[in-house]
C-alpha cells in the first residue's frame, strides 16, 4: 500500500533575553504528514473512497434506472472510483494486461500487417500498440468491464458528491451493470474470448449502448436548463496527445450511432419491454446498419471457403467476415455512405490468412451477397476502394472465361 506525503516547512521564532544582550534564534523543522490511501486496485493504482453522500446518490440513480428499464438489479453493482489520471492509468494498465494474455507470439504483428495490407495504416506493430494505449487513456469518461462486472469512473479528489456530469456517466455505466446481471454478459464474453470468435459482439454491443444512451438521456431530461449548463461545464477534457487514425472510430459509429437509431425504432415499436427482449438477441452488424433487416430477422449466411495449397505460403488463421468488417476496410477510402451501403448487402463471408517465411501475408476472401444486385454493389465498392489507391494498377480483361478488373 502506498501513501501520499505532504511536507510542511514551519519557521519557529524563539526569543531569549539576558542583561547584556538580546539574541534571536530561528530554527527550521520539517513535519511530514502521511495520508492513508483508501484502497488500490489490482494494478496498484489508488482508488478513492465514496462518501456517504455519493452512496446515497448511487442508490437514487439505481432506483431511477430500475424504474426506467423495468428491470431489477440482482445484486448491488460493483464500482471503483479514481482520479482522472488514476482512471487513465487503470485504462492503460488493463489494456496492456489483456494484451499480454490475449495475443500469442506473432499474432499482433500479423494483425497489424493485415491492416497494412488493406491500406488502413502504415504504422509498425510497436507504433500501433502505442496509439491504442493512448486511445485507451483518452477516449473514455467511464467504463463497465464485462468480465469482472465492475463500473469505473473518474472523479475529483476530496469531493463530497458526484457532480451532474459524473452522475450522467454513472447512469450510462450502471445500465451496463444491470444488463450484465440480466443477460450474464460476463459468461457470454468469456466464451467469445476462449473461442477467439467475436462475431456476435458488435450487434449486442450496439443494443447495449443504445439502451444505455436512452436511459442516460431520460436522466438528463430531468435537469432544468441551469443544471444542464452546469453539467456541460463540468465535463473534463479528454484530449489525446496523438492523432488517431479515423478508422479507430468506425466501430463506435456502429455502437453509438446506428445502434442508437435502431433502439429508437425498437422503443417506438414496443417500448422498453422490446428493448429488454433485444438484449437477449444476437443481431448481426448488418441488422444494426439496416433496421428493417433487424425487424425481418434476416439471417447471416455461413460461407464455406476452401483452404488453398500455396507455394511458399502456409495456413495461419481463418474467420468470418461481417458488415462491420466491410465498413472498416472500405470507409476511409470510399466514404461512410458508400461503405455502409455495400455492407448492408452482405449475406455472409469468410477469409483465410496465409504467411510465408518472410512474414508476408496472403489473404483469400469469399463473400456472398443477399442477392446478385447486392453482390455487384459490394464488388463495385471494392473496385472503387482499389481505384482510390495509387499502389494498385488496374488491368481490364475481356477474356473468354470471365470479364472484370485485376489490380
Range-by-range predicted roles:
Residues 243-366:
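Pan-zinc metallopeptidase signature
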Amino acid at each position: 500500500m502506498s501513501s501520499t506525503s505532504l511536507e510542511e516547512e514551519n519557521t519557529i521564532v524563539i526569543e531569549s533575553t539576558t542583561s547584556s544582550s538580546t539574541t534571536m534564534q530561528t530554527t527550521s523543522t520539517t513535519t511530514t504528514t502521511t495520508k492513508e490511501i483508501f484502497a488500490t486496485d489490482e494494478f496498484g493504482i489508488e482508488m478513492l473512497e465514496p462518501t456517504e453522500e455519493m452512496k446515497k446518490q448511487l442508490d437514487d440513480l439505481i432506483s431511477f434506472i430500475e424504474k426506467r428499464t423495468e428491470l431489477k438489479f440482482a445484486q448491488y453493482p460493483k464500482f471503483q472510483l479514481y482520479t482522472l489520471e488514476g482512471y487513465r492509468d487503470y485504462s492503460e494498465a488493463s489494456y496492456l494486461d489483456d494484451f499480454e494474455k490475449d495475443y500469442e507470439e506473432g499474432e499482433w504483428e500479423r494483425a497489424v500487417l493485415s491492416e497494412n495490407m488493406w491500406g488502413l495504416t502504415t504504422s509498425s506493430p510497436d507504433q500501433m500498440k502505442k496509439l491504442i494505449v493512448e486511445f485507451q487513456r483518452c477516449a473514455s469518461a467511464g467504463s463497465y468491464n464485462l468480465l469482472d462486472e465492475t463500473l469505473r469512473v473518474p472523479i475529483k479528489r476530496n469531493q463530497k458528491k458526484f457532480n451532474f456530469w459524473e452522475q450522467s456517466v454513472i447512469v450510462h455505466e450502471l445500465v451496463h451493470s444491470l444488463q450484465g446481471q440480466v443477460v450474464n454478459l460476463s459468461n457470454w464474453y468469456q466464451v467469445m474470448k476462449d473461442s477467439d470468435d467475436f462475431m456476435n459482439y458488435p450487434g449486442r454491443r450496439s443494443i447495449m449502448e443504445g439502451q444505455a444512451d436512452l436511459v442516460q438521456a431520460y436522466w438528463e431530461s430531468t435537469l432544468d436548463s441551469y443544471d444542464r449548463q452546469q453539467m456541460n461545464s463540468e465535463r473534463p477534457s479528454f484530449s489525446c496527445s496523438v492523432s488517431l487514425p479515423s478508422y479507430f472510430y468506425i466501430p463506435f459509429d456502429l455502437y453509438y450511432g446506428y445502434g442508437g437509431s435502431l433502439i429508437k425504432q425498437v422503443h417506438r415499436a414496443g417500448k422498453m419491454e422490446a428493448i429488454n427482449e433485444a438484449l437477449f438477441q444476437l443481431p448481426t452488424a448488418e441488422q444494426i446498419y439496416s433496421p428493417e433487416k433487424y425487424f425481418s430477422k434476416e439471417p447471416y449466411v455461413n460461407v464455406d471457403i476452401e483452404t488453398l495449397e500455396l507455394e511458399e505460403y502456409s495456413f495461419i488463421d481463418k474467420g468470418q467476415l461481417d458488415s462491420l468488417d466491410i465498413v472498416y476496410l472500405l470507409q476511409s477510402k470510399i466514404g461512410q455512405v458508400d461503405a455502409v451501403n455495400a455492407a448492408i448487402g452482405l449475406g455472409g463471408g469468410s477469409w483465410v490468412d496465409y504467411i510465408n517465411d518472410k512474414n508476408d501475408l496472403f489473404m483469400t476472401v469469399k463473400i456472398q451477397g443477399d442477392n446478385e444486385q447486392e453482390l455487384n454493389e459490394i464488388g463495385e465498392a471494392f473496385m472503387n476502394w482499389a481505384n482510390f489507391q495509387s499502389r494498385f494498377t488496374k488491368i481490364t480483361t475481356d477474356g473468354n472465361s470471365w470479364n472484370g478488373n485485376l489490380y
